[in-house]
Amino acid sequence: MHTLTLTRPDDWHLHLRDGEALAAVAAYSAREFARAIVMPNLKPPVTTVVQAAAYRERILAALPPGGPAFEPLMTLYLTDNTPPAEIDRVAESGFVHALKLYPAGATTNSDAGVTSLSGCLPTLTRMAELGVPLLVHGEVTDPQIDVFDREAVFIDTVLQPLLAELPTLRVVMEHITTRQAAEFVLAAPDNIAATVTPQHMLMNRNALFTGGLRPHHYCLPVLKREEHRAAIARAVTSGSTRFFLGTDSAPHARHAKEAACGCAGIFSAHAALPLYAEAFEDAGALDRLEAFASFNGPDFYRLPRNTGTVTLKREEWTVPASLPYGNDTLVPLRAGETLRWQLAG
């Protein structure tokens, strides 16, 4: 197969940052995707519909003039103090589509995250009543729990009790990384879904250490053993409608990654579709890429599927060693390496 044409896809988990960083990266996503669920973990975080409206305008202003149409789908950052009334405003807004749960301290800019779900129960109950999805960074932050086990422990100790309390809450497990998460979603009712990144389909934790410490392969949740990567790939390419594309593309300046205490996050927006195509091709499931990239997400979010198309061609190209990022540079996933697929045109 030399070309592959897909209904124009969406990215259901994206970090666009703000200011100069936003201006540097927005066009990459707009080139490949019609829409994206935009993460709210700015400094300060986006916690209200009013703040989300202002951020949405900044995103639209950062898109290159004359470029492809791109719709940012906004989210709010759930805090211990998010009132149920804000959920009503979300449901009425037409442009805020979900709330994001960051356990406090779990990832980049998560200090304002939730310290106890029990304190959020009235707000979560209102979300369940109105059908507003909760997007979950599914890791516990207890320092006694091994970093490689934090997703599995989260499912057992946080997510399952929450769903026992609120069984109709619509939940997206973001960037799943473990066999346990894949099995949980496959066995769960239709109100539970998951996004999957290209790196968690393509790489295991060896990629962090091959030839030395590889900071540009460090993200959270961290890459796992090969058995988990393989389980994720099997689930995603199985034909289940409960898994959909979410890059978690997360730009950081090169100096912030190559540091004594480097930031977590992998930038993949420059080549997201080629990376996913490689993963699906490796699994012998290219015929299932379109549903994962273009159908399952809008169906879960109760949004119309896109009508345009994008075409990939199977032609090798070399990923640049770095990309401009304001006054700095960033190192993209597969920097300096060869990819098999690229966007046509």
Curated annotation (Swiss-Prot):
It holds the Pfam family Amidohydro_1. One of its GO terms (molecular function) is dihydroorotase activity. Binds 2 Zn(2+) ions per subunit. Its cofactor is Zn(2+). Substrate binds at H15, L16, R17, N41, H137, L220, H252, A264. Belongs to the metallo-dependent hydrolases superfamily. DHOase family. Class II DHOase subfamily. This is Dihydroorotase. It comes from Laribacter hongkongensis (strain HLHK9).
